[in-house]
């Protein structure tokens, strides 16, 4: 089933394949999974918080908080989905939760401030409440989008703010009267002051006018003298510049004449120098031609001999390299053969050791299995005989042929001797009951000496159901 949430909603999915919860805008809801939808739009909560200042003065703080999930933080959305989304945003549960946090933080903060501080620092008080409430709401994934704190209101029976307002009004009225009186006083004083200042300023202006007129006349004379002086200086400068220009012109004419003569001499010398250079170039080319000819004659023979020697040396070097490579290859082959032989020997020994280890393990496992089987067998036998250890021991000795083995050993020991043999009989040799019972009597005749011999050699007594030895024999 494919589900899509609206623009202001989220899907909360739980169930198979999801470790905790999953938030999504759209998703497939698989069998074994469940989902719910929660809205992200904020909600307005209006409260009238009753608090008490540090002077134990109660007051009412009307406030409107706009609170909703923090949409820009995935961790906060997960907290909101787990803790708040199962409840309706407008339900009493959510409202009581938010109201409890706001009232608690407001009362704690108000208790640390005086009424005057709360009244005059409403903005700071609001910021403190906002910060502390937001800190508590973070653990539920909620964010305060807006918080409006209205004017503080008196609790019925406590008219602090009304008295404070009356006080402010009276202070304002008194201040207004004082301001009116001060304004009248300032008006009268100002009028007289203005008249005096007018007379003073008129006299001052007359004096300053005379001074300025004399200053202007002196400045005019100084300016005339200054202008005449500057004109004379300018004339002298112009005459000096004309003389300097004439001198420079004469110098330049002399330099130009000298340069022309030098150029003529340099031209003549350059022609002679170029002639000598060309003649030297001709001689050098002749010498190079002769040198190249001699090189061609003598170096050709030397080059041939050099190439021959180089080829012979290269051949000797190549032969020695090949011989060295052959010896190296032979040594490598021998080393690889020895290594292969060592690897084969090591592998054979490893396989033999592993086979022996496997045989020992299997033998040990067989012994363990046999021991377990014998334990089960003895346990079953002991249970069948009513946990009679003596009966189990005798059964095992009889079943294992121990008595026969003991008799055989005793017979071997007394072979060739004349042992004393006791024979018990019932004294009825000539009675008419001979026949089948005779064989049974013979068996019973054999048992007493066998039991006695076993007792003498091992100290073990026969079971009660097979007979009892006389006391004299035991002693």
Swiss-Prot record:
Gene Ontology process terms (BP): nodulation
Entry's Gene Ontology cellular component terms: apical plasma membrane; caveola; plasma membrane
Signals that turn on the gene: Up-regulated during the first 7 days of nodulation.
Subcellular location: Membrane, Caveola; Cell membrane
Short name of one Pfam family: Band_7
Organism superkingdom: Eukaryota
UniProtKB keywords: Cell membrane, Coiled coil, Membrane, Nodulation
Coiled coil: 235-255, 305-325
Expressed in which tissues: Expressed in roots and nodules. Primarily expressed in vascular tissues. Upon induction of nodulation, expansion of expression in the root cortex in the region of elongating root hairs, which will eventually become colonized by bacteria. Expressed in the infection zone in nodules.
Record flagged with keyword Transcription regulation: no
Keyword Coiled coil tagged: yes
Chief place of localization: membrane
Record-stated family: Belongs to the band 7/mec-2 family. Flotillin subfamily.
Other comment: The predicted palmitoylation site present in all other flotillin-like proteins is not conserved.
Role summary: May act as a scaffolding protein within caveolar membranes, functionally participating in formation of caveolae or caveolae-like vesicles. Required for normal infection threads initiation and elongation and nodulation. Probably involved in polar growth of the infection thread.
Protein name per its UniProtKB record: Flotillin-like protein 4
Originating species: Medicago truncatula
Record lineage: Eukaryota, Viridiplantae, Streptophyta, Embryophyta, Tracheophyta
Gene, per the UniProt record: FLOT4
